[in-house]
Amino acid sequence: MSSINTRTRLPARKALFMAVAFAVSHPFLFASNAKADSDTMVTAPVPVTANPLGAGSDEMVVPVSVLSGRELSLSRESTLGDTLRTMPGVSATSFGPNASRPVIRGLDSERVRIMQNGVGILDASSLSFDHAVGIDPLIIEQIDVVRGPAALLYGGSAIGGVVNAIDHRIPKEQLDGITGRGEVRFGGAEDQKSGAIVLDAGNGLFAIHADVYERKTNDMDIPGYAVSSRKNREDGTPREHRGRLVNSASRADGGALGASLTFDNGYVGLSYSGHDNKYGVVAEEDVIIDQSTDRWDLATEFKDLGNIINRVKFRIANTDYKHVEIADGNPETRFSNRGNEGSLEIGHGNIGKLSGAIGFQFQDSKFAAIGDEAFVPKNQTQSRGVYVYEELPASLVNADDLKLSLGGRVDRVDVDSKGGDRFGPALSRDFTPKSIAAGALFKINQQWSVSGNLSSNQRAPSYFELYANGPHIATGQYEVGNTDFDIERSRGVDAQIRWKSGKHAFNVGAYHTRFSNFIGLFSNGLMFDEDGVVDPAGELAGADFEQVKATFTGLEADGKFRIYEGRGDLDLTLRSDYVRARNRDAGEYLPRIAPLRLGWGLNYSFNRFGTSLDVLHGFKQTKVAENELPTDSYTSVNATATWLLPTTTRLEAFAKAYNLLDDEIRDHTSFLKDIAPQRGRSLLIGLRGEF
């Protein structure tokens, strides 16, 4: 696929490289301290998502996982979904190696809100699983994953959870000198060649940021055939292309510039970022997606302002997203999503012991799909929401051993269709979803704590759930929405028990969510041609968006234990998750639900050397929906080795071995599980540096 390796926006990347060089080569801008003291260059950790008061993950009522630092560096993959897919409670849509969104507790698409620095991503990834998320993990510094309903703070589209990708493109801390990191990677099953440079510089008052990255891959090596033997037996699909996933090559590049005025108690900053991604759609051997995103961000936050209002935070992003789907070298369907999203949050001082925040969020996006395969009309979505979140410490056994939380939110959402020949006349729907949540965290002693959360959540239907009407080639379906949908309503309960003692820790959680009118895409048993005509010989299975009663019930657990200290340290890690999702109206299972997974790992470090072994077993999934094939079990075995080089600048070489058993791994959460397995046995090497 030589066309994938064609550069599309070289001038923009050149400008970014020049900006990086300028930042590094002009020390007079930062004359106060041209050589940075390494002790002063450590960036303060960003508070985790899902709590406006800045509580740490151990202090959260809802379960939150934070991936950052070296752990994130060794977990990075080409997509956000694949970077997170082994976390407890998290899987991925896995539409080949180039497009993969996180799935949280069996929920995906609109119910998992993907954010960048606390502001939503405007792209097309929730519309179709073959559309990549407009973020590259190479430049991310931290990822917060909120598992479970987060509609209170982020709106109904966060009813399944939140993934917040955090970078430092707008510097938030005072910086005196220059700091940065760089990374290169080679190899892997997709013959990857990638690299990234991230630089920050400042003089105590003014700080700038620059980053650039690029990734090239070829078609991915796979164990055996792309088509599963089960699908071959079921419908006679021929088993071709042994050892290679055809049309899975890619090329991505981009970068950003940012600048801030930083003060003792806050900052004001602006950034621009550009992202280009050109990749093969593995569901069709002759289709390429050429994607680009331009985004401007403005952010400010000031703390310690006074007794009544002690904190103010404002963020807004303007996004211009577009992609074109190219078949046999000819542009066919074009997609665009342009709009603004932002929030204003005000934290108040203690009222007695009560602390909290009120906030206002807004979004205005215009989406268009033009071409023969456009299955949604041009549309506009506008939302406005206000929320309040409060915490109150209390005493149950000991002083302040109990923390209570309470919050509520109201939104106004307008979803307008512009109509069209296929979609009928223009139509407007408006919704007023409301959400409320109450939780508690009880510290039994220094080691043990328990927490629980009750929530009632409402979500407005998305534009494609309302207005879809056309062939969706990526899923092989003719999809039809329903303009009469009501607000989606659910109630949930979530509970965790946590233990931490020295170098040992574990968490166990359970949850149950009950939907009174879950919106899902269900087969109608008919076959269609691309014009929407019922045809038993048609290639598209009919699928309608419907509202049904549904339940999601699951368990999650993870732990880390220091089992040896002496000549080095050896840690044992354990993890597991399970979710069961049912359509209560039909008495059937819901589609694409991950099976029970059990995992363990060993991590050893000694002086400059480190190594790890990770094993994850996914059980056979037989609890399947109508017209869905079961998925066989698998065992994924990966290993990592690192070596910190004896240099004055921190340089670390690393090697990652994937799928050491060369097992045929198929994710049940993927639409393509029976035609696109995970990578085969492979080795990736790289070098990472920090200064």
Regions found by a protein language model. Name each.
Residues 354-356, 395-398, 404, 511-515, ...:
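Gram-negative outer-membrane beta-barrel transporters
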Residues 42-75, 101, 109, 119:
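N-terminal periplasmic "start-of-domain" segments of outer-membrane beta-barrel proteins
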Residues 120-147:
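Short acidic/polar hinge/loop motifs at secondary-structure boundaries
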